[in-house]
Amino acid sequence: MAVRIEMPSVGLSFTPDSKESIPIAIVTGGEYDGERLYLNDDSKGGKKPKKKLSFAKAKIDKMRSRDRADLEMKLQEAFHKGVAPEHLLIEGDGVRELYEEMLEEVKKDTSVELPPESQFQLIPSPKKDVREIWYIAGPSGSGKSYIAKGLAERYRRMFPDRPVYLVSKLKEDETLDAMKGGPPRRLDVQKLVDNPLKDLDLLADSMIILDDYDTFTKPFDKAVQKLIDDIATMGRHSNTTMLCLSHYLSNYAKTRLLLCEATHFVLYPAATGNHALNYLLQTYLGFDKDETAAIRKIKSRWVCIHKNFPQWVVSEHSANLLHHE
């Protein structure tokens, strides 16, 4: 009888395993071009049996049920604590090898690496009744508009009857105006000042892009901030997906509500100061120091983090699950 180890209830795969599987990115370039990366969710139970790790060591196979149960519990505890195999304090022939096998199996389900010629492109949720808030933060020229353009084009492809709106200080935007299917519909900021949008149903079932919203000055800044706050708090009822592009990872009091409600964060670690990155990841995403350091070490221009359970991180060439238990 094999030792049974409880595995993560979610995993990453290029093949959906149920109707609940959600595509979170698509591959462009190379032999995997066009492949979708899915988040396969078994957290509701019953979709597939828990994985079972077999190990040939006779002393483990022949353990008494009580001893085997004790070993399972200890290995599971070590797994949850993130104990490395070389630091495992559980004694017994073959125990460390079993633990290493367990970690290797987990890694297969929770991380994906792409070859250099391929890269991930982010995509919005295909579910009609899901609203998302994407906070895309980085300095000028980092590629914020390019990310927003890709998301908006995918949104249009998924929902051809839904409009995409743009609020921008610029009269022309070379990147966003070049969207496939034509430029987004511009909302007149002066009208937002004169007649604040009182009914969010006017933006129901739509996507709205707020380009460098933090650059607006009086009297437009308050009108734009009110629009953002209203969508953040009430947009879930109208299925309004919002992309907020900003130069700042956090503007403290001004962004507190938005960051609390955001579902996705797109960051540019190499172009971001340590203090700002640490503050955002640890305050709003619950990262510890080691996880924060790991984000900075990712070799990618951008990194996208899904805030809610299960947390995942996607960059240009890799994807990883975090806090998936």
Q: Which residue ranges define each predicted feature?
A:
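Conserved ATP-driven motor cores of ASCE-family P-loop NTPases powering translocation/secretion/packaging/pilus
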Residues: A2-S13, K180, Y248-Q311
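N-terminal pre-Walker A segment at the start of P-loop NTPase domains
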Residues: R4-L122
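Phosphate-binding P-loop
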Residues: Q121-R131
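Conserved P-loop NTPase motor cores
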Residues: E132-R154, K169-K171, R185-F287
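Post-Walker A helix-loop "phosphate-sensing" segment adjacent to the P-loop in P-loop NTPases
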Residues: E153-P163
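Conserved RecA-like ASCE P-loop NTPase motor core of nucleic-acid helicases/translocases
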Residues: P163-K169
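Active-site regions of enzymes building and remodeling cell-envelope glycoconjugates
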Residues: T175-V193, A319-L321
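C-terminal helix/juxtamembrane-tail motif
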Residues: Q311-E325
